[in-house]
Amino acid sequence: MAASKYYGLSIRNLAYRLRKFDEVLGKELVKTVLAHEQEIIEAITEDQLYERGVNGDDVEIMTYAPYAPSTVKRKIRKGQPYNRVTLRDTGEWYKSLRLVYDVDGFYLTSTDDKNKYLKDKYGPKILKLTKENLKNIIYKYIRPELSVKLKKYLQNGTEEE
């Protein structure tokens, strides 16, 4: 009763609007996730790879594919971290990452020539969010925005404001 009073709707109308929102939820989710492409990419490149040197399963990359001694020397010379695999040398690969959506879901891809080599050597999970970062993205960006969209949809009965 409180919901119908709050929105000034009958229960039947409210239920109808909820069903209609369910129909557009997938589209809204895609739009919301793609709107946060940069935050998702930074969670992977900055937190997972550069700061912690882990893949999407939260496994330290150094444990299964450590840097070659020549790479360690080059990293020391450049003043870059060498105690973990960051996959950053010039930063071009990081900058080339893009979030893509297709029938299989969301995934990161890259236009950089090194992408295939890096995925082959370090595994495709280097471009996967850890559970913790996925949770952070959902709670910080996705959930609040979808909640606002749901409230607007219930009030207006449409996607428009």
Please name every model-derived segment.
Residues 1-161:
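Short, Lys/Arg-rich flexible segments
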